[in-house]
Amino acid sequence: MNKKILQILEYDKVKEQFMNALTTAQGQQELKDLKPLTDKEKIQLLFDEVADFRLLTQENGLLNLGKTNDLTEILRRLELEASLSGKEFVEIKKVIQLGINIQRFFDEAENVETPSLAITLEKLVDLSALVKKLEIFDNAGSLYDNASLELMHIRASIKSHQSEIRKIMQEMLTKNLSSLSENVITIRNDRQVLPVKAENKNKIAGVVHDMSASGQTLYIEPNAVVSLNNKLNQKRIEERQEITRIYRELASQLKPYSFDIRQNAWLIGHIDFVRAKYLYLAANKATLPELTTDKDITLFAARHPLIEAKIVVTNDIKFDAGLNTIVITGPNTGGKTITLKTVGLLTILAQSGLPILAADGSRIHLFDDIFADIGDEQSIEQSLSTFSSHMTNIVHILAQADENSLVLFDELGAGTDPKEGAALAIAILENLRERNVKTMASTHYPELKAYGVETQRVINASMEFNIDKMQPTYHLQLGVPGRSNALEISRRLGLPETIISVASQQISDSEHDVNQMIEKLEEKTREVIESSRNIKKIERENQSLHKDLTKVYNQINREREFELEKAQKEAQEVVKKASLEAQEILKNLNDKAALKPHEIIAARKELEGLAPTIDFSKNKVLKKAKAQRGLKQGAEVNVTSYGQRGKLIRLEKDGRWTVQMGSITTRLNEDEFEVIESPEQIQAKTKNVSKKVTSKVKAQLDLRGMRYEEAELELDNYIDQALLANLIQITIVHGIGTGVIREMVQKKLQKHRHIKSYEYAPINAGGSGATIAILK
């Protein structure tokens, strides 16, 4: 795309609006290098990245990025094996750490997928191992003492020497106060010295390192610390040598990763730029327009990004595929130029992958180039008039524009005789129309109104003017040609009516009719626009509501999945625990060579007890699901409110069912009846269990005539058989006799854990000679 259009439309000024949101040098450089694209897939990917980031932020909060500087020169020197400073190592560390933080943020993000951003993230190289090597620096770029064992020893020695020197110097300071010009210990040539009065220089033996400007003070290093200072300086030399060695070793370890570090820096910069686009999008209520290749430009609530938000006027601009040319007529200062610039600028921004100031649903066609003749480009050096300057530019545009270009003309044909100017304007527009070039032109020539009405694929437009307030509203009116309001404005400003009447007589009847027609058309257009705005407001509210509902729905689904997963895990734990206990029970059973029937029953009860009892009767979800499976035409139901059976006839629109109960037909809600399963359904759910029955168990046992031991064994076996046969009540006839057998029966029943209760039989059924027992 030509550079001139970027200058005319002030493209770089709009780019500057993104700069404050960028925190990395690489992100700022990507913004500076940004140019409009023509590849739809590349632009769409840029939009998709912003959409991904918006979704990510909504679900997980805003990604925080730290400030980083440009590593280009640092990495170049690293590759040349030149020495780096501690601060430069810290700059490398910042970039590496930031890459790790970004990767961690995306890895830990929940409830969102970012396929477009994943393309960039997949290229990030894991350099976490290098961070550990760079942790030897503090934020200022100084090495920590533990950067190496040698450095630790050297610095410990330095501190020891400094402490010893400080102690001696403090003693000498106190002892020689009268000989000093100041009561301080100072530094000269990296050595601690005392400020001695010149006349007292012989009182303190030592080395003179400096003299004050007046010559009144000598800075003397006492002989008592010369040796210690020499040792201290030697240790400092060793410290510098060790630091240099550490730097060199670290640089050699980083050099093989210089390409990865550089790539990560640019990838981080790209993420930073995507983040800045999102922040611009959110702060300005901007949109990511739909990209088209069918020459359709549809902008809803379009705003010029360089006009302050408080005063900017939004416009709906529909320059669809069926139109070639829009001719905006009417007086100056109405906003025609801003409208042209808005269309061109928003198109360029969209083709740069940037959000545009418009409402959702906007569409932008991708142009190969955009040309404009806007503003006064008169050249004094070339001695060109205003008209000549414009015409030179127009000649260039006509030579370069093709069917995939957008052309913008401001005041086409101005600067010359009105009739000739209008004729030229029509001829230029017709040339572009015949070549199928998308064109928008503003003009104040009335002749172009007729051209807009009479010519196919050309439409008139105008900027609305409020007569009552005598000022433009800056609203674009498509389909309505502009009209002059000179007479009405003059009347309101106080021009005598006689003059206005004479002026009005100079205007032909046809022109009066046209102006009246335009006035009515403007009124109708305003009504349509107002109605359209109300509809769009409702649409936006519906979209917002739909968005909120979708978010709530997704949240409910996520919570449901979480609860299901949680329940599944709990169920697995229950099953696992029950399985282990069952295995233990079975093991105990296997350990016994033979089991009595009552022991088998006890084991079975124990196994049954492992299964958790769950009450689903109050589970509304299951009840609803069950009801939905059974609710169909012809299904048999039990009508709970009537206590009768019925049949479902049909489902009504209000959600109720028509139910036939004999000769009665009524409408019922689903909670007023229950589905009755058919015999086939019951049979399908029933599992056949074969039982081997050796003999039919009677409900009565007669122990009369048996010995004690025989009766006791017989009673045990009988109770076991009764339990296996699922008997509820048994009768044990023991007779009265001596009472020994009766007492044995009573004790057995009392201790048996499967006996719920027992009592003597009624008088007519044996009285105290028989005992009736109820089984659990």
Curated annotation (Swiss-Prot):
Q: Which SUPFAM superfamilies match?
A: DNA repair protein MutS, domain III (SSF48334), P-loop containing nucleoside triphosphate hydrolases (SSF52540), SMR domain-like (SSF160443)
Tell me the InterPro entries matching this sequence: DNA_mismatch_repair_MutS_C (IPR000432), DNA_mismatch_repair_MutS_core (IPR007696), DNA_mismatch_repair_MutS_sf (IPR036187), MSSS (IPR046893), MutS (IPR045076), MutS2 (IPR005747), P-loop_NTPase (IPR027417), Smr_dom (IPR002625)
> Which GO MF term does the entry hold, naming one?
ATP-dependent DNA damage sensor activity
Q: What class of enzyme is it?
A: hydrolase
Magnesium listed as a keyword: no
Note the SMART domains from the entry.
MUTSac, MUTSd, SMR
Among the GO biological process terms of this entry, one is:
rescue of stalled ribosome
Instruction: List each copy of the Smr domain by range.
Output: 701-776
Q: Any keyword Nucleotidyltransferase?
A: no
Give UniProt keywords alphabetically: ATP-binding, DNA-binding, Endonuclease, Hydrolase, Nuclease, Nucleotide-binding, RNA-binding, rRNA-binding
Query: What Enzyme Commission number does this protein have?
Result: 3.1.-.-, 3.6.4.-
HAMAP family recorded for this chain?
Answer: MutS2
- Homology family: Belongs to the DNA mismatch repair MutS family. MutS2 subfamily.
The subunit field of the Swiss-Prot or TrEMBL record says:
Homodimer. Binds to stalled ribosomes, contacting rRNA.
Q: What does this protein do?
A: Endonuclease that is involved in the suppression of homologous recombination and thus may have a key role in the control of bacterial genetic diversity. Acts as a ribosome collision sensor, splitting the ribosome into its 2 subunits. Detects stalled/collided 70S ribosomes which it binds and splits by an ATP-hydrolysis driven conformational change. Acts upstream of the ribosome quality control system (RQC), a ribosome-associated complex that mediates the extraction of incompletely synthesized nascent chains from stalled ribosomes and their subsequent degradation. Probably generates substrates for RQC.
The protein here is known as: Endonuclease MutS2
Give the species.
Lactococcus lactis subsp. lactis (strain IL1403)
